[in-house]
Amino acid sequence: MLTSGLLLVAAVAFLSVLVLMSVWKQRKLSGKLPPGPTPLPFVGNFLQLNTEQMYNSLMKISQRYGPVFTIYLGSRRIVVLCGQETVKEALVDQAEEFSGRGEQATFDWLFKGYGIAFSSGERAKQLRRFSITTLRDFGVGKRGIEERIQEEAGFLIDSFRKTNGAFIDPTFYLSRTVSNVISSIVFGDRFDYEDKEFLSLLRMMLGSLQFTATSMGQVYEMFSSVMKHLPGPQQQAFKELQGLEDFITKKVEHNQRTLDPNSPRDFIDSFLIRMLEEKKNPNTEFYMKNLVLTTLNLFFAGTETVSTTLRYGFLLLMKYPDIEAKVHEEIDRVIGRNRQPKYEDRMKMPYTEAVIHEIQRFADLIPMGLARRVTKDTKFRDFLLPKGTEVFPMLGSVLKDPKFFSNPKDFNPKHFLDDKGQFKKSDAFVPFSIGKRYCFGEGLARMELFLFLTNIMQNFHFKSTQEPQDIDVSPRLVGFVTIPPTYTMSFLSR
């Protein structure tokens, strides 16, 4: 009895010492780090956060501690940046210091710092430079890719016509269309819309992405070192990510067997050729793992961002039929019904441009941004961020900054129109992030959004199962990404 009592006292004393050491360490750092709520050992600020509304939880904390504060997600120390001025100051004015990539635990299970999106330093720079050049070689930013988008838009319109006005969920209609554009670049060909393997890939992408937006996905961000070994929905996300990697690996192996170094067919071929050229370079970043995971980065990002934005956009246009009618009027006046829209038409279509920008602003697809990491001890305002500190640039707080948008919670294309009805840019329009690590697919995404939306709206009216006033446009999930509500709609020929 005495022995067990002594053991209990010893255990309590040991835990007390650990707690005191943790608090002391955190307080020691707080003289350099921005202020924030006091964390508990091991769990950090978990008890102060609503994992179902992580973005809103962090913004609520910023009301107390200001636009720069420190939060602990479990043992992860994060500096959170809110508002246009703060985010720009970090990502643009101190771009190099904030250019490291922070953690995204779900995707890090697979990527582990390889590929283009989740890497840092020289690897990220080399892969980014190569990817930008290679995408340009295959027509991105040129007439060639515009023709590819227009061709795919034609296939999409045909598939909508075949629904004969029935109510459908547009999710996979959109994702397979958008995915075929990036597929033609990275794989050299498009998929048939009914290809079962293709549809399986799209489900894997959507499933793994949706997990990151769930409450459990946010809990996993805090306790991944333990949860990756436990049963739960994270295991399904891992299975989906593994399935995507396996598919890309199979594609790469096929290209290896049929490669002509003098005639690259696609992004994979170009990377394989670069691997051959750098075979004797001991410091090369061009090897199989980076090829597979960079290709997956491009395939994933090139599919989900634009298709999810369009899906949210359709819902918003059904909610606000007067806005839909104005877009129809501008399309009829500038383009007419007898030719396909061209990307250059946007210069004469300020209202449509404003609507597309407002859809992106309202959708706010990556509200907390991709996490950054400071590359060295960094002085930021009155604080000192130790090398390796993770940073959340809250892109949603920029897209909803009341200094730039009069009614940031409302969907209103006037946010991007001047007094004369002409399109106006905004320094707070950052859906593709800003600075050195902005999304280099921005140009392609802008072209896709304009051409797909105008092609579809040139041919169809949108009809909801609900009256406009009853449509709820609140997101279904908000975590690492924003997931719009699930709905069905009808495409009625004009």
From Swiss-Prot:
It is a peripheral membrane protein. It catalyses: an organic molecule + reduced [NADPH--hemoprotein reductase] + O2 = an alcohol + oxidized [NADPH--hemoprotein reductase] + H2O + H(+). Keywords: Acetylation, Endoplasmic reticulum, Heme, Iron, Membrane, Metal-binding, Microsome, Monooxygenase, Oxidoreductase, Phosphoprotein. Its EC number is 1.14.14.1. Its cofactor is heme. Highly active in the 15-alpha-hydroxylation of testosterone. Also active in the 15-alpha-hydroxylation of progesterone and androstenedione. Little or no activity on corticosterone, pregnenolone, dehydroepiandrosterone, estradiol or estriol. There are only 11 differences between the sequence of testosterone 15-alpha-hydroxylase and that of coumarin 7-hydroxylase. By site-directed mutagenesis it has been shown that modification of position 209 is sufficient to convert the specificity of the two forms of the enzyme. This is Cytochrome P450 2A4. It comes from Mus musculus. The lineage of its organism: Eukaryota, Metazoa, Chordata, Craniata, Vertebrata. The gene is Cyp2a4.
